[in-house]
Amino acid sequence: MTQINFNASYTSAPTPSRASFDNGYSEFCDKQQPNDYLNYYNNPTPDGADTVVSDSRLQAASNFLASVNSLTDDNDIMECLLKTTDNLGEAVSSAYNAESFELPVAEQPSPSSAYNAESFEHPVGVNQPSATGTKRKLDEYLDDSQSVVGQFNKNKLKPKYKKSTIQSCATLEQTINHNTNICTVASTQEITHYFTNDFAPYLMRFDDNDYNSNRFSDHMSETGYYMFVVKKSEVKPFEIIFAKYVSNVVYEYTNNYYMVDNRVFVVTFDKIRFMISYNLVKETGIEIPHSQDVCNDETAAQNCKKCHFVDVHHTFKAALTSYFNLDMYYAQTTFVTLLQSLGERKCGFLLSKLYEMYQDKNLFTLPIMLSRKESNEIETASNNFFVSPYVSQILKYSESIRKVKFPDNPPNKYVVDNLNLIVNKKSTLTYKYSSVANLLFNNYKYHDNIASNNNAENLKKVKKEDGSMHIVEQYLTQNVDNVKGHNFIVLSFKNEERLTIAKKNEEFYWISGEIKDVDASQVIQKYNRFKHHMFVISKVNRRESTTLHNNLLKLLALILQGLVPLSDAITFAEQKLNCKYKKFEFN
């Protein structure tokens, strides 16, 4: 079995920006690198591969890890920053300088869900080939039976769109109706006062401008990732090791770290990615959302060299960050690499100011420029106990049908036996309030000869609003005393995420996927009333999520109208509609 050195150094693929770092070979020679390091690059291996581990670079990487860990001690912050700058600088500079003289490599392949990497035995003292995403002829070394496969099971739902490009021009007519304000924790006046009276004047005192230095621009334009591996430890509960600076963490992990755990949660912050062992997370007891879970134990055990990855987000990402102190590693790594790119004089100038602000505690009393999660209107409404018109209309118009309620039927054997046909049958259902009302409150037409009715006529007057945490909480709160009421709410969030809640007497039925703005489980726990049935759609793409939500609405109509027992509906939903059932019950 190949012995894996988790702290081994590496050489990643060259980029134009790093190729010119430190102004080329002349400065590299002036730094007087160790002889073994220079001898390696003067005598490359026959196949041109970057395979030899430099002792100096290995030691530098170890020093960097030690300096990162030292930040958790009560050391002087200035000493920590300077020490880490030196140690990380040695490691990163070695890699940067080395890459300036690498032989050209093949073009990086397009992203894919699987990757075959070397698992053959390497000679002693030789590092495994770099897994930086470049194409290589692996057939020379191994056959398919020896391959290691990595799959990155990213959430296929389209992420929140953020326009990052700069328009070439804009007119007043185009912009007059666009609101560019961001609601911040601190007031605009406080933030403006800080930048006007302290931030800008201090920086204006720096007069040593180096117009020829391009380190900072090169650093900010880099597209690689600092990769950390979070794994079990025999001594401590867990350990975090710095792996490599690579262009593709999936290929690198699959090639060299699959023995740690072949199921991995990936936490990404800008240029830093943490590869967290699935088994480690399970042992900690952190709740894993169903939509972000990895494959089951049986699938993982089929091939230990096939790695499965999930890019985590939202509440789960925050939980992992807090438990493993990933914010500390991110801040330390980002701070050190950023200061190094500024150069010695600018770095010293800023460190002096930061240390001064740390000593007088000014650093912790500055206006915090964090945007609020919800808009000003929602915050104002919440503070003034203002009930959303959408929620008010639902309660108002559902009162008029309280005597009719949902159609009440005995369980129907035909419906139970033909659930798959009935639920998956094409229909004219849309995610409008009136359309869903027709589905839930009128007799479900599983046969063409079933007579409909107009139970939902009044509900067609309800005007739907965009979804938010505020509206969900209001809907539940307004139903506290409405014990025998029958009503429902449909909400659309960003990225076309959907949430449907239906109430029948003292039971709520939830249909949702992964929603960034609302954690349904937490909302229910906070509400702490009645019985709640949750149908959570697993991770699928947007189109499939929409189809599954519509099919679950049809299934919900059958449940509410008594045509299908809840137990049969749950079994069908989990087996046929790719969703997970959860139940919450309170006294």
Curated annotation (Swiss-Prot):
User: Keyword NADP, does the record have it?
Assistant: no
Domain of life where this protein originates: Viruses
Against Pfam families, the record matches this protein to: TATR (PF03430)
Output this protein's name: Trans-activating transcriptional regulatory protein
Q: Does the keyword Transcription apply?
A: yes
What keywords are assigned to this protein? Early protein, Transcription, Transcription regulation
The root-end lineage is: Viruses, Viruses incertae sedis, Naldaviricetes, Lefavirales, Baculoviridae
Query: What GO biological process, any one, is recorded here?
Result: viral genome replication
- Organism source for this protein? Bombyx mori nuclear polyhedrosis virus
* InterPro entries linked to this entry: TATR
Return the similarity comment. Belongs to the nucleopolyhedrovirus IE-1 protein family.
What the protein does comes down to:
Regulatory transcriptional protein, which trans-activates gene expression from early baculovirus promoters. Can also trans-activate its own promoter, suggesting that it is autoregulated during normal infection of insect cells.
